[in-house]
C-alpha cells in the first residue's frame, strides 16, 4: 500500500510501473483513445469533473489527479490485480489516510463489478473528485464525513471486462460483452455461497456471522475463485468495514439482502435478520434519486418484472435469486452491511448522459454514506482499559452478531428503537445494556468486561448466570 505524502506517489508508480502517463508520456493500451482525443474530451469538465468514460490509463490518471489536489486527506492503494494484470485501484479519503482510527467507521463503494455496467465506475471517479473539491471549499457535510469516516472508493472491480466492453465500436454496446472477467467468470456469482450455510445454521444451530473466520488460506487455494474475487475477500477480511454499496447497471433500484432464496425458488422474499435496517438503508439511497423513487416509472425493459420494487427498493430474493453474490458475502463473512444499487436502464449508456446520471445520484451517494453514523457504536475493554478484540456484540431479537475490531471498537447499524445489547468474549463475564437508538447520530455504548480467568472452574457457570441477571436488571 502506498504511504502518505510524496512517498505515496512513488509507491504507486512503482506498483504500477507506469509513471510515464503522469510525467508527460502516454500509457497507451490497445483500443484506448488517442492522447489528442483525451485532451479534447477533458475540456468537457465542470469543477474538475470530466463527464466522460475513463479507460484504464485515464482512470489511474483521474485518481492521481484527486490525490495531487487533496494529498492531506487522500491515498491511493491497490488490493490486487485482475486476471490480465490491471491494478484494482482504491482511493481512500480520510483526515488520517492509511490509518484505522479507533472509533472511526470504515466505508466502501465498489463499482464496475460487471465490466459492461459502466455508470457506477464513472460515478465513483466523479465522487472522489467531488469529495476533494467540496472538502477544500469547506462544505460542512463533506468535511464532517471525511473527519469522521474512512472512505474507500474502488471505481472498477473488473477493469478487464470494462476494457473489452469499451473497445466495441459505436455507442450501442452489446448487453453481455465484458460482463464477466477475462476468464469468463461472473464475479457476482463467484463468492463462497455463505447463504446456504447460514440457512442450515438457522435450522440446526450454528454461527450467524463471520462464516469464513480464519479461512484466508482456504480462499487462496480455491482454484474456482477469480483473482478479483480473492482480492476483495482479503480486503473485506482485513479492514473492519461497516457499510458498503456495490454499484451495477441494467435497472433502477436499490437491492438489499438476502439475494439468494431459502427454498431455491427463482423469486421469493428472503429476509435477513437485519431486514428493517437494510430496507432503511436502501431507501436512504433511492429516495434521493428522482427516477429510481418515481412510483410511476415504467419498467426499464418491456418484459421486466419489477413487481417486487417498493419506493425504488427491492429485496434481492424477491426480485431474482443470486447465489454466490458479493452483497450477501459481506454480511455473512464480516461486520459489513452491503446493498446493491442498479443505476441505469442501459448498462453502457452514451457518454453525453453521464452528467445527468451524476446529477441524479450525487445526493444519493452522499446520503448513503451518511448512514454509517446510525445505530450504536462504542468500545469493548477489560477492567484495566485494555481493548478486547473479537468480542461479540449481540442484539436481543436480531439473530446476527457483530464483533469488535482490534482496538475494541465496534459499530452496530440499527433503526431507531429500544434495544438490549450484550457484549461477550471468551474468558470474560458478559455484560448487557439497554439503549435507546435515535435515527442519528449513533448512540455511544461502551462495555467493560471482567475476566474470570482466576476464578475456580466450579464458580464460573454460577457467576456467569448471576452476572447476566444483574446486568440486565440494573443496566450496567
Swiss-Prot record:
Residue stretches making up the Peptidase M14 domain:
52-372
Q: What is its main location?
A: cytoplasm
- Give the protein's biological function: Sorting receptor that directs prohormones to the regulated secretory pathway. Also acts as a prohormone processing enzyme in neuro/endocrine cells, removing dibasic residues from the C-terminal end of peptide hormone precursors after initial endoprotease cleavage.
- Lineage: superkingdom: Eukaryota
Sites carrying a glycan are: 139, 390
Q: Does the keyword Secreted apply?
A: yes
Native species: Pan troglodytes
Record's catalysed reaction(s): Release of C-terminal arginine or lysine residues from polypeptides
Q: What is the name listed in the Swiss-Prot or TrEMBL entry for this protein?
A: Carboxypeptidase E
The protein's required cofactor(s) are namely: Zn(2+)
Give the UniProt family note. Answer: Belongs to the peptidase M14 family.
Top EC class, one word? hydrolase
Residues of the signal sequence?
A: 1-25
Amino acid at each position: 500500500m502506498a504511504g502518505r505524502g510524496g512517498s505515496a506517489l512513488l509507491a504507486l508508480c512503482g506498483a504500477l510501473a507506469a509513471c510515464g502517463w503522469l510525467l508527460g508520456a502516454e500509457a497507451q493500451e490497445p483500443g484506448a483513445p488517442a492522447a489528442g482525443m483525451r485532451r479534447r474530451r477533458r475540456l468537457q469538465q465542470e469543477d474538475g469533473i470530466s463527464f466522460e468514460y475513463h479507460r484504464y490509463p485515464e482512470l489511474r490518471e483521474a485518481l492521481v489527479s484527486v490525490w495531487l489536489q487533496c494529498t492531506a486527506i487522500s491515498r491511493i492503494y491497490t488490493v490486487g490485480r485482475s486476471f490480465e494484470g490491471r491494478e484494482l485501484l482504491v482511493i481512500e479519503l480520510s483526515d488520517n489516510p492509511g490509518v484505522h482510527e479507533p472509533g472511526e467507521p470504515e466505508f466502501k463503494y465498489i463499482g464496475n463489478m460487471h465490466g459492461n455496467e459502466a455508470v457506477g465506475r464513472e460515478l465513483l471517479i466523479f465522487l472522489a473528485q467531488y469529495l476533494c473539491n467540496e472538502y477544500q471549499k469547506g462544505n460542512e457535510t463533506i468535511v464532517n464525513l471525511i473527519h469522521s469516516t474512512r472512505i474507500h472508493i474502488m471505481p472498477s472491480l473488473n477493469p478487464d471486462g470494462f476494457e473489452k466492453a469499451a473497445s466495441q465500436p459505436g455507442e450501442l454496446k452489446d448487453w453481455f460483452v465484458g460482463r464477466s472477467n477475462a476468464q469468463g467468470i461472473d464475479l457476482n456469482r463467484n463468492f463462497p455461497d455463505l447463504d446456504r450455510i447460514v440457512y442450515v445454521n438457522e435450522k440446526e444451530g450454528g454461527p450467524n456471522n463471520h462464516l469464513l473466520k480464519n479461512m484466508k488460506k482456504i480462499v487462496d487455494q480455491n482454484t474456482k475463485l477469480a483473482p478479483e474475487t480473492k482480492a476483495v475477500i482479503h480486503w473485506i477480511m482485513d479492514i473492519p468495514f461497516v457499510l458498503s454499496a456495490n454499484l451495477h447497471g441494467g435497472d433502477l433500484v436499490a437491492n438489499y439482502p438476502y439475494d439468494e432464496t431459502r427454498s431455491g425458488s427463482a423469486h421469493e422474499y428472503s429476509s435477513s435478520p437485519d431486514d428493517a435496517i437494510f430496507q432503511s438503508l436502501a431507501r436512504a439511497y433511492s429516495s434521493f434519486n428522482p427516477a429510481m423513487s418515481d412510483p410511476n416509472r415504467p419498467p426499464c425493459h418491456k418484459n421486466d418484472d419489477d413487481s417486487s420494487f417498493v419506493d425504488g427498493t427491492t429485496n434481492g430474493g424477491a426480485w431474482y435469486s443470486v447465489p454466490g453474490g458479493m452483497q450477501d458475502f459481506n454480511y455473512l463473512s464480516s461486520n459489513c452491511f452491503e446493498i446493491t444499487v442498479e443505476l441505469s436502464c442501459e448498462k453502457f449508456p452514451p457518454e453525453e448522459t453521464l452528467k445527468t446520471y451524476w446529477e441524479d445520484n450525487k445526493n444519493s451517494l452522499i446520503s448513503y454514506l451518511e448512514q454509517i453514523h446510525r445505530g450504536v457504536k462504542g468500545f469493548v475493554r477489560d477492567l484495566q482499559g485494555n481493548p478486547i478484540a473479537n468480542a461479540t456484540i449481540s442484539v436481543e431479537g436480531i439473530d446476527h452478531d457483530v464483533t469488535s475490531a482490534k482496538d475494541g471498537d465496534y459499530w452496530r447499524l440499527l433503526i431507531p428503537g429500544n434495544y438490549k445489547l450484550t457484549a461477550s468474549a471468551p474468558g470474560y463475564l458478559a455484560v448487557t445494556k439497554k439503549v435507546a437508538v435515535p435515527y442519528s447520530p449513533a448512540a455511544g455504548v461502551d462495555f467493560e468486561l471482567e475476566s474470570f480467568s482466576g476464578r475456580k472452574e466450579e464458580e464460573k457457570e454460577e457467576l456467569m448466570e448471576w452476572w447476566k441477571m444483574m446486568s440486565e436488571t440494573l443496566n450496567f
